[in-house]
């Protein structure tokens, strides 16, 4: 939607009307937003909810989207305060995401794995928060198991444009799903209130039968499906401009990623030379030790942020804690993230990172967490996602309490890694500094992978091979990342592109404010508004419309 449309209506936009639209939109999204493997879009689903992708439900989404969009367009007003203009554009991004889901990436028509997420992933979504399991959660679990048959029936009707690489991934994911789902529900049954789910066993068996039949159905059809998974340049640009509000072309994104990759590789080389002879990081002895170490580290990071005047951390912000990966989640590893960032209704509960037992054969990120939890905590916990979303849940402006796009969130998490590195948090651990540069290297490589997958320059297999060789990660991590990024174009660029946008925003603020610039104040604004795309933060903080004009097709002025 052009900036001129969004900001030129003669009618005066009402803040109350915009807030009402936001409430209506997010209530609707809680009932219709797809389950994904991204840990940031935490929705408060209605009790008893289950995904519905029947033809009637899809048509209902289109009808409701049109109604909400008309209300949004009627609230455009160039004379409204800047904060209201930002909120209006932010809600426009949310509406654009629904259009992207339906007609852009269109996973419900193209990706058989989408329905694995709506079934098995929906079960993981119920199991992810820590115990206790009350009767409401028991009913939610049963509702999602019972919905599997109808969801997978709808899948067969909907997948008119299914792509073979996605189908092969879904077939592989569902291999052995019966014992895995049975193990998960049997384990969680021991946690449920007596009598709260008397049909759990039968419901599990019915879901297993539906999933196994779906897998068999895919196996009979995958050979006739097209191999191409790219969404194409036009759709990708639409995502950047309307959903993520990122004002760059694919070619500019590639240049940014490659420059950041060169920087990360160079700095990793400098660090390795500096650290020659330093001992390797040992594994923690067990999960209990890892949990205790992570708790001490999280507290120390809070103190460090205050001591260095980097960021204000309210004393009552809930903790980011490690917990032992329970058997019900262990059985379903790979079907969802293993971090629970709570939600608006659970804002006081804090965030949980579920951890497996520390062994040398863990994947790239889990292994680093078992060596020095701080490397994970600064991105995922404090001052990263867990802290950012906790602040977001408290935002005085209710429009900004929700997740819209991961570009700013992941950019902030990546920025936090490097901020803490440069601020000296890891001065006591040379190998952890190297680890952070390895993280930055992988995140830079993700830009290339994201763009090339979206434009057709990489197959999923080529993307995985590229990540494994260039980032030096294990094969499973590379495969999972490539598959996930192919299914969610535009997601993987956010880590580096968001970080670079933050760097540019900081530099512009320092230049504009001169001696009045305070890093802590800048960070406090940035973190509080961590759900707001950085092109909108630039408008609000600096009064700079250049990035929004670029989104609307007007040339940027350097």
What name fits each language-model region?
Residues 12-558:
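N-terminal maturation segment of proteins
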């Amino acid at each position: 939607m052009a900036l001129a449309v969004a900001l030129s209506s003669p009618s005066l936009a009402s803040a109350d009307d915009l807030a009402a639209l936001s409430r209506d939109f997010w209530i609707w999204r809680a009932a219709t937003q797809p389950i994904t493997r991204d840990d940031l879009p935490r929705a408060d689903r209605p009790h008893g909810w289950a995904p519905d992708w029947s033809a009637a439900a899809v048509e209902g989404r289109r009808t409701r989207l049109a109604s909400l969009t008309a209300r949004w367009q009627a609230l455009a007003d160039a004379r409204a305060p800047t904060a209201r203009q930002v909120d209006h554009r932010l809600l426009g991004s949310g509406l654009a995401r629904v259009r992207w889901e339906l007609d852009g990436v269109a996973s419900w028509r193209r990706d058989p794995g989408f329905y694995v997420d709506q079934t098995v992933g929906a079960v993981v979504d119920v199991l992810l928060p820590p115990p206790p399991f009350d009767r409401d959660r028991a009913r939610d679990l049963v509702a999602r198991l019972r919905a599997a048959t109808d969801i997978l029936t709808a899948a067969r009707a909907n997948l008119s444009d299914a792509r073979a690489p996605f189908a092969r991934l879904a077939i592989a994911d569902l291999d052995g799903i019966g014992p895995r789902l049975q193990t998960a529900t049997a384990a969680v049954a021991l946690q449920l209130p007596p009598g709260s789910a008397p049909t759990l066993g039968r419901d599990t068996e019915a879901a297993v039968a539906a999933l196994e039949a779906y897998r068999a159905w895919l196996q009979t059809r995958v050979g006739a499906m097209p191999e191409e998974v790219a969404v194409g340049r036009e759709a990708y640009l639409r995502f950047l401009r309307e959903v993520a509000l990122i004002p760059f072309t694919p070619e500019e994104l590639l240049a940014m990623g490659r420059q950041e990759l060169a920087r990360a590789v160079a700095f990793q080389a400098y660090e390795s030379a500096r650290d020659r002879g330093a001992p390797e990081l040992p594994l923690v002895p067990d999960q209990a030790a890892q949990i205790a170490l992570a708790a001490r580290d999280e507290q120390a990071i809070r103190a460090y942020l205050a001591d260095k005047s980097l960021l204000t951390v309210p004393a009552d912000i809930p903790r980011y804690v490690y917990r032992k990966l329970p058997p019900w989640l262990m059985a379903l590893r790979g079907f969802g993230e293993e971090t629970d960032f709570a939600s608006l209704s659970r804002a006081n509960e804090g965030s949980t990172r579920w951890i497996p037992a520390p062994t040398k054969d863990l994947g790239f990120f889990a292994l680093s967490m078992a060596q020095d939890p701080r490397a994970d905590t600064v991105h995922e916990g404090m001052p990263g996602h867990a802290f950012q979303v906790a602040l977001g849940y408290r935002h005085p402006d209710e429009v900004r309490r929700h997740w819209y796009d991961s570009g700013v969130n992941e950019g902030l998490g990546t920025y936090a890694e490097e901020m803490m590195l440069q601020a000296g948090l890891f001065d006591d651990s040379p190998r952890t500094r190297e680890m952070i540069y390895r993280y930055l290297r992988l995140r830079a490589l993700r830009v290339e992978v994201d763009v090339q997958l979206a434009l057709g320059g990489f197959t999923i297999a080529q993307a995985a091979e590229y990540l494994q060789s260039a980032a030096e990660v294990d094969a499973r991590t590379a495969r999972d990342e490539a598959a996930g990024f192919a299914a969610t174009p535009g997601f993987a660029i956010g880590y580096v592109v968001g970080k670079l946008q933050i760097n540019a925003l900081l530099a512009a603020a320092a230049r504009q404010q001169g001696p009045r610039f305070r890093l802590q104040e800048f960070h406090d604004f940035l973190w509080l508004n961590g759900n707001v795309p950085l092109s909108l933060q630039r408008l609000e903080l600096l009064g700079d419309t250049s990035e929004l004009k670029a989104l609307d097709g007007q040339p940027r002025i350097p």
